[in-house]
UniProtKB/Swiss-Prot annotation:
Upper lineage: Bacteria, Bacillati, Cyanobacteriota, Cyanophyceae, Synechococcales
Residues binding ATP: 264-266, 351-354
Keywords, comma-separated and alphabetical: Aminoacyl-tRNA synthetase, ATP-binding, Cytoplasm, Ligase, Nucleotide-binding, Protein biosynthesis
Record-linked PROSITE patterns: AA_TRNA_LIGASE_II (PS50862)
Function (record text): Catalyzes the attachment of serine to tRNA(Ser). Is also able to aminoacylate tRNA(Sec) with serine, to form the misacylated tRNA L-seryl-tRNA(Sec), which will be further converted into selenocysteinyl-tRNA(Sec).
Organism: Prochlorococcus marinus (strain MIT 9303)
Name of the protein in question: Serine--tRNA ligase
Keyword Acetylation appears in the UniProt entry: no
């Protein structure tokens, strides 16, 4: 969430910065609400000061010997009571305005970083670097064809169980998924991340705090009778691990590696990636999440991206790093690097991780602060997939496919899977 004082006092700045995202905004209404709230706050503070003055005067007169029931003292007390009533009315009006203001602020995305490249959409994103040599060939299969040959997952039966865009991993497929999760978690925890396995059901406050609500309500699965939603990413519950907390600066950074199933309705993606593991309603992911001091967030962004890259490098999967332009940024992000893994069968790069710096955007929504010698201020947060497990499996199948129908696995994964290849059963 944006700083309401900044919106109130510098609406042109906010409009210009969000214009870099391709948004056209009229902040007049929001600015008016913010100014009304400020005026009420000033009136309330003035009345409270007057009430305090009257209270002190009553106390002084009684100490000086005045009768507590004397008319002058009674009149002062009456004035004090009237002020309390006026303050109560103003506080109620303030609460109503605050709710309206917060509702509007929650709908505004984060401001893009000054370092973020300008652009309208994904066509203006910029490649930063590549790693590995992409495998190419005319006869290479896409991952779902390989999976069918090896009987790695069930699609048709999953539709019977649930609906489309679900899969049931079977045999070697389930085993490989489990191996990948354990490998990713072990790699990250060996670098100092603390492992987290959070709830997969989260409340509205958690989704609001991370930035998924209110904008992405249609993308999420919601329980009918409870204030609970299926989490779209572990970023949501991990953000709220420290909601309404003050974290001492000497405890930062806090670095978490969280595995969770993720659930997304994928509204608006009809007809896209209907086969295989790329776009599912339910998938597994290992999420990296940092709480950092505001002075260190830029360096942390480089590191969290490198940590996500380390998984791809260990698995010998060629990839490229793309920096998103201002028009393609996610709602909560101020700057993002996407990691795109090469899929030889598809002959294309596909996103497998987004590593984003959110500044104080999520912290303001979630009231997460830090305290040092300079005082108390909002913390900065960062997140990155480390990695999306299903897409990693897809890349492994396409990269390791052999002419005999088997799939050769990278050496780093062999201790977790138990052998060096997938073979027809």
């Amino acid at each position: 969430m944006l700083d309401q004082r900044l919106v109130r006092d510098n609406p042109d700045l906010i409009a210009n910065e969000l214009g870099r995202r391709g948004m056209t905004l009229d902040l007049t209404g929001l600015q008016l609400i913010a100014q009304q709230q400020r005026n009420l706050e000033e009136q309330r503070s003035s009345l409270q000061a007057e009430g305090n003055r009257i209270g002190k005067e009553v106390g002084q007169r009684i100490q000086q010997g005045s009768d507590p029931k004397a008319s002058d003292v009674a009149e002062l007390r009456h004035q004090g009571n009237l002020i309390k009533q006026k303050v109560a009315v103003l506080e109620d009006e303030e609460k109503q305005l605050s709710a309206r203001l917060r509702e509007q602020l929650l709908s505004l995305p984060n401001l893009p970083s000054p370092d973020c490249p300008e652009g309208r959409d994904e066509n203006d994103n910029q490649e930063r670097h590549c790693w590995g040599k992409p495998r190419e060939g005319k006869d290479l299969l896409e991952h779902w064809s390989i999976a069918e040959r090896l009987n790695l997952f069930e699609t048709e039966r999953s539709v019977r169980i649930a609906q489309s865009r679900f899969v049931t991993l079977m045999g070697q497929g389930a085993r490989l998924e489990r191996a990948l999760i354990n490998f990713m978690l072990d790699l990250h925890t060996s670098k100092g991340y603390r492992e987290v396995m959070p709830p997969v059901l989260v409340n509205t406050a958690s989704l609001t705090g991370s930035g998924q609500l209110p904008k992405f309500a249609e993308e999420s699965f919601r329980c009918a009778e409870d204030d609970l939603w299926l989490t779209p990413t572990a970023e949501v519950p991990v953000t709220s691990l420290h909601r309404d907390e003050i974290i001492p600066a000497d405890q930062l950074p806090l670095r978490y590696a969280a595995y969770s199933p993720c659930f997304r309705r994928e509204a608006g993606s009809y007809g896209r990636d209907t086969r295989g593991l790329i776009r599912l309603h339910q998938f597994n992911k290992v999420e990296l999440y940092w709480f950092v001091h505001p002075d260190h967030s830029q360096a942390a962004h480089a590191q969290i991206t490198a940590d996500a890259e380390a998984v791809l490098q260990a698995l010998e999967l060629p990839y490229r790093v793309i920096e998103l332009c201002t028009g393609d940024l996610g709602f909560s992000s101020s700057r993002t690097y996407d990691l795109e893994v090469w899929l030889p069968g598809a002959g294309a790069f596909r996103e497998i991780s987004s590593c984003s710096i959110c500044g104080d955007f999520q912290a303001r929504r979630s009231a997460i602060r830090t305290k040092d010698q300079k005082g108390t201020r909002l913390i900065h947060t960062l997140n990155g997939s480390g990695l999306a497990v299903g897409r990693t499996m897809a890349a492994l199948l396409e990269t390791g496919q052999q002419s005999d129908g088997s799939v050769l696995l990278p050496k780093a994964l062999v201790p977790y899977f138990g052998k060096d290849r997938l073979e027809p059963e």
